[in-house]
């Protein structure tokens, strides 16, 4: 919500905040539904997205690079361990964003690269607030996330942890039309 500070009294402004998949974001900017978009992707797909942005005549600027952390309930036993590794999550339920999508890459390959391979139980949820409510209230759930502000974690009773063996790199890229 920091962007709302840019809205000055007496100056007209409208912001639309929508969570969606990368292709919907790209198409919305190309169709001029929106002037800007932010696309998140795993760094291993960077060439694909760079070529796509070029093909769609979009300019892109990296605004963040990060590794996902895990969030869980502050009351979960893992929240109090000195060190957490991937094996600790085997009996847990993974809360996942419901649309891990990379166009022209087979869906099975995207799922393999985005989902924790040895976890057998998942809840797919699109909306961030619902994800956080589930994590705070359903025992033995976890989710991979970009860095989350402490105030938001506190609001939902969550903690953010680094997990050994989970070092996938991601990028958030601002896109806009070249014209």
Could you tell me what each predicted segment is?
Residues 32-33, 66, 81, 91-92, ...:
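Structured helix-beta-strand junction loops
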Residues 1, 40-42, 74, 97-101, ...:
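Structural motif
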Residues 20-25, 29-35, 39-40, 99-160:
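Hydrophobic hinge/microswitch elements
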Residues 14-17, 57-60, 94, 122, ...:
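Conserved beta-strand scaffold positions in the cores of enzyme catalytic domains, especially
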Residues 52-68, 72-94:
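Flexible hinge/capping segments at coil-to-helix
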Residues 2-5, 45-47, 86-115:
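Secondary-structure junction motif
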Residues 1-50:
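Central regulatory/effector-binding core of bacterial HTH transcription factors
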Residues 74, 159-179:
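A late-sequence structural motif
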